[in-house]
From Swiss-Prot:
Residues 19-26 are annotated as: G1. Monomer. This is Elongation factor Tu. Belongs to the TRAFAC class translation factor GTPase superfamily. Classic translation factor GTPase family. EF-Tu/EF-1A subfamily. It is found in: Cytoplasm. Residues 81-84 are annotated as: G3. It comes from Flavobacterium johnsoniae (strain ATCC 17061 / DSM 2064 / JCM 8514 / BCRC 14874 / CCUG 350202 / NBRC 14942 / NCIMB 11054 / UW101) (Cytophaga johnsonae). NCBIfam families: EF-Tu (TIGR00485), PRK00049.1 (NF000766), PRK12735.1 (NF009372), PRK12736.1 (NF009373), small_GTP (TIGR00231). GTP hydrolase that promotes the GTP-dependent binding of aminoacyl-tRNA to the A-site of ribosomes during protein biosynthesis.
């Protein structure tokens, strides 16, 4: 079968393998590409190609991640696999690889292990909506009752973290068998991908969400008015749309878009991902500054207090050399600007060591446009010391 070109007519989803070290995440990733390439949908990637993950920098943090792409009959997937546990934590907390769903790999020989639990918890915290389970190494377990027990244990764990443990698919197979073309195990890889196709839902694309653009720069065009530039984060900006400008001390300014410019051309509209200049009616250059956010009226509110899941960099990663304590006051770099905030640690936590990940509460000195899932870096004197995302808005 001839290799197809990248086909944009298929819906695109981002997924990844998660689970305990040595349970077979990378072998499974290789097996998926092997089985789907035999079906003519993608190029196979070997274990070594995937395991040898390149370093990437995301919000000042170095993460090793492997990106693989493949297609099923119905969808196109970008799949992320990380070599080390710390890379997973960093990847999920910083959102370096946003996941629309995940494949949880659990070795039947071990059952759920500490990192299995930790990855499910992180998935819940950072909003991975659905999880499909692949029970691996089933060929190494002779006892059918044991397999049943392991599956029950996994389902209980998913339910505990508010996933649908009762109804979610659990596929029992062997990643190595699938990779080695074993006729007993190849169908299980196909069954897994059918489960992924059916269970993991297509996400609402950014364009379909309400309009939001963080302001990067502001200038005046003589005779035409004030222009705010930035990259549209979500939604669409049309000429004639009413907007609000909020955050960083803006007292809910309202305006109307009188023009959208991109690459020095006038357009009717700009959409998520575009770098644009918006011409704003009745707004003075002095009214608006970097760090404010232009939104569809009423869609987002400014907030100053929130809870967040964060990862604190190790010394070797360029982070702090010493722990920090309650009431630590770093800067939070959100979208386009730094805001100072005060960190409150959870009860019973005296201090936070470099390399930790935990839930904190933050009080910012000035409110900013905020929603659950908003990502940020924690900085001190211009260097990144941590990263995270908002899990709950307090006020």
């Amino acid at each position: 079968m001839a290799k197809e070109n990248f086909n944009r007519s298929k819906p695109h989803l981002n997924i990844g393998t998660i689970g305990h070290v040595d349970h077979g995440k990378t072998t499974l990733t290789a097996a998926i590409t092997k089985v789907l390439s035999d079906a003519g949908y993608c190029q196979a990637k070997s274990f070594d190609q995937i395991d040898n993950a390149p370093e990437e920098k995301e919000r000042g943090i170095t993460i090793n991640t492997s990106h693989v792409e493949y297609e099923t009959a119905n969808r196109h997937y970008a799949h992320v696999d990380c070599p080390g546990h710390a890379d997973y934590v960093k990847n999920m907390v910083t959102g370096a690889a946003q996941m629309d769903g995940a494949i949880l790999v659990v070795a039947a020989t071990d059952g759920p292990m500490p990192q299995t639990r930790e990855h499910i918890l992180l998935g819940r915290q950072v909003g991975i909506p659905r999880i499909v389970v692949f029970m691996n190494k089933v060929d190494m377990v002779d006892d059918a009752e044991l397999l049943e027990l392991v599956e029950m244990e996994i389902r209980d764990l998913l339910s505990f973290y508010e996933y649908d443990g009762d109804n979610g698919p659990v596929v029992q197979g062997s990643a190595l068998g699938g990779l080695n073309n074993d006729p007993n195990w190849v169908p299980k890889i196909i069954e897994l991908m059918e489960a992924v196709d059916n269970w993991i839902e297509e996400p609402v694309r950014d364009v379909a969400k309400p309009f939001l653009m963080p302001v990067e720069d502001v200038f005046t065009i003589t005779g035409r008015g004030t222009v705010a530039t930035g990259r549209i984060e979500t939604g669409v900006a049309n000429t004639g749309d009413p907007v609000e400008i909020i955050g960083m001390g803006a007292e809910k300014l309202t305006s109307t878009i009188t023009g959208v410019e991109m690459f020095r051309k006038i357009l009717d509209r700009g959409e998520a991902g575009d770098n644009v200049g918006l011409l704003l009616r009745g707004i003075d250059k002095a009214d608006i500054k970097r760090g404010m956010v232009i939104i569809k009226p009423g869609s987002v509110k400014p907030h100053a207090k929130f809870k967040a899941e964060v990862y604190i960099l190790k010394k070797e990663e360029g982070g702090r050399h010493t722990p920090f304590h309650n009431n630590y006051r770093p800067q939070f770099y959100v979208r386009t600007t730094d805001v100072t905030g005060v960190i409150s640690l959870p009860a019973g936590v005296e201090m936070v060591m470099p390399g930790d990940n935990l839930t904190i509460e933050v009080a910012l000195l000035s409110p900013i446009a905020m929603n659950v899932g908003l990502r940020f870096a924690i900085r001190e004197g211009g260097r990144t010391v941590g990263a995270g995302q908002v899990t709950e808005i307090v006020e």
